[in-house]
């Protein structure tokens, strides 16, 4: 007897029909889970490739931003840089989410409070070299947030891929074999009853024929 098989099921034709229906539904569910897992893996690989490209660009941006701020320091002096840095705008990160195949993917939005370093103020009062540095580092910060967002997405996708795999394995290796075994046992019992009934009827028929003779 297979482990986990429910032998309390009544061996009737209705139960056989129900069990076979459950097998079909389980197989359909398994196909859907496999399709979902494939879609999640595809999304995972796409985001992974995107992150690799973003990190390569980020390294270049860091080098460029550092070079630009060095130039600004030489042209305008370190004191001017510190004065502008102390006036820097505050930034806020808003966390939202989107749904991909049932997985919540975090989305991060960066907003800046430009009440001090407004575009107008920067155009009039901030030297071009320092203003260029500000823009570069703002973009650097924004790109870094995007990478963090996508890495969090990868983490969530990976967990869902693992959950989907476990569910698929449970259906494929436990549920379906158990249902198929139950259907087999019910069918064997029904066939045996049918043979017994046929044998009994045949015996009765012979007795009736013998009595008539």
Swiss-Prot record:
Keyword terms: ATP synthesis, Cell membrane, Hydrogen ion transport, Ion transport, Membrane, Transport
Cell compartment(s), UniProt: Cell membrane
GO CC aspect terms: plasma membrane
Topological relation to the membrane, as annotated: Peripheral membrane protein
Similarity comment: Belongs to the V-ATPase D subunit family.
Function, in words: Component of the A-type ATP synthase that produces ATP from ADP in the presence of a proton gradient across the membrane.
Full protein name: A-type ATP synthase subunit D
Organism in which the protein naturally occurs: Thermoplasma acidophilum (strain ATCC 25905 / DSM 1728 / JCM 9062 / NBRC 15155 / AMRC-C165)
Lineage of source species: Archaea, Methanobacteriati, Thermoplasmatota, Thermoplasmata, Thermoplasmatales
């Amino acid at each position: 007897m297979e482990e986990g098989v429910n032998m309390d099921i009544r061996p009737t034709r209705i139960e056989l029909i129900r069990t076979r229906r459950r097998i079909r539904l389980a197989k359909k569910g398994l196909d859907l889970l496999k399709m979902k897992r494939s879609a999640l893996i595809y999304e995972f690989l796409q985001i992974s490739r995107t992150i690799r490209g973003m990190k390569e660009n980020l390294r270049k941006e860091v080098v460029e931003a550092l070079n630009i701020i060095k130039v600004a320091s030489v042209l305008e002096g370190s004191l001017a840089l510190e004065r502008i840095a102390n006036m820097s705008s505050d930034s806020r990160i808003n966390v939202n989410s989107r749904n991909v195949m049932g997985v919540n993917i975090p989305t991060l939005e960066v907003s800046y409070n430009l009440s001090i370093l407004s575009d107008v103020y920067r155009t009039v009062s901030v030297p071009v070299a320092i203003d260029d540095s500000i823009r570069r580092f703002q973009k650097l910060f924004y790109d870094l947030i995007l990478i963090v967002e996508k890495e969090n997405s990868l983490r969530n996708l990976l967990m869902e891929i693992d959950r989907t795999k476990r569910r698929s394995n449970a259906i494929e290796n436990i549920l379906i074999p158990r249902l198929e075994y139950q259907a087999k046992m019910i069918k064997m019992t029904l066939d045996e009853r049918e043979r017994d009934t046929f044998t009994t009827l045949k015996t009765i028929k012979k007795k009736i024929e013998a009595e008539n003779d």
